[in-house]
């Protein structure tokens, strides 16, 4: 596995669980608001690459104190070794939460069929007709829709997540997006952090807005 980060303990990434978090290298989207730019290239920096053996050693040591492992990215489903890696996690008795953008339903289908994931969180970037704008690429919307259906019908715990990028999405867009969420599925809105955006224009707009805010008297 091409791993780019490892957090041995997290209380907020796996709902209701104490978990470790593993970050995979590489993403097929180029969302202008992304704040994890270092994870986008498929080729990792040798200086920051995380050794899988070290991760497994730490998890083996702590497995009785952890409730699960979150595999996030980047986009984990780009990793050819993902099923093998998840099987290693399951042999430790750890539940697995997968964070995905939903662009590879074929991979997701295999993981669900082999019961390698216990929770799936899928990003829902925008109304379907605005996906190219919010992902920065000409993406296959039908693939995301297929992943959504797989998740909802799998019986696995799941959630859909959206970052509220106000410069790129309107109130009408948010309403249309909410209509895309399957009935009965959890949907959460995430904070947009413009200071770390990939698009310099979003960073500049945030800086300008901050500069225009009145300051409290000393």
Q: Where do the PLM segments sit?
A:
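N-terminal [4Fe-4S]-dependent radical SAM core
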Residues: 1-23, 32-44, 61-65
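Hydrophobic packing within well-folded, soluble alpha/beta domains
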Residues: 27, 31-34, 89, 98
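Non-heme iron-sulfur electron-transfer modules
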Residues: 41-56
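Conserved AdoMet/S-adenosylmethionine-binding subsite of the radical SAM
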Residues: 56-68, 77-204
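Conserved strand-to-loop "acid loop" that flanks and positions the catalytic carboxylate
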Residues: 74
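A structural motif corresponding to the C-terminal lobe/cap of the Radical SAM core domain
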Residues: 205-209
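Terminal, non-globular segments
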Residues: 214-218
């Amino acid at each position: 596995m091409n791993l780019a980060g490892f957090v041995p303990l997290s209380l907020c990434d796996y709902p209701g669980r104490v978990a470790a978090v593993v970050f995979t290298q590489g993403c097929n989207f180029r969302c202008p608001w992304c704040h994890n730019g270092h994870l986008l290239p498929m080729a990792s920096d040798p200086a920051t690459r995380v050794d899988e053996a070290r991760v497994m050693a730490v998890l083996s040591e702590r497995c009785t104190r952890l409730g699960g492992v979150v595999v996030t990215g980047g986009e984990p489903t780009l990793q050819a070794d993902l099923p093998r890696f998840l099987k290693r996690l399951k042999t430790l008795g750890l539940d697995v939460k997968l964070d995905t953008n939903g662009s590879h339903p074929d991979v997701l289908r295999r993981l669900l069929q082999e019961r390698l994931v216990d929770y799936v969180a899928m990003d829902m970037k925008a109304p379907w007709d605005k996906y190219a704008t919010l992902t920065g690429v000409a993406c296959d919307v039908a693939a995301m829709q297929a992943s959504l259906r797989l998740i909802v019908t799998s019986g696995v715990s799941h959630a859909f997540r959206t970052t509220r990028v106000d410069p790129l999405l309107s109130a009408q867009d948010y309403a249309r997006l909410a209509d895309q969420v399957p009935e009965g599925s959890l949907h959460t809105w995430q904070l947009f952090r413009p200071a770390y955006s990939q698009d310099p224009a979003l960073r500049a707009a945030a800086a300008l807005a901050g500069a225009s805010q009145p300051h409290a008297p000393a």
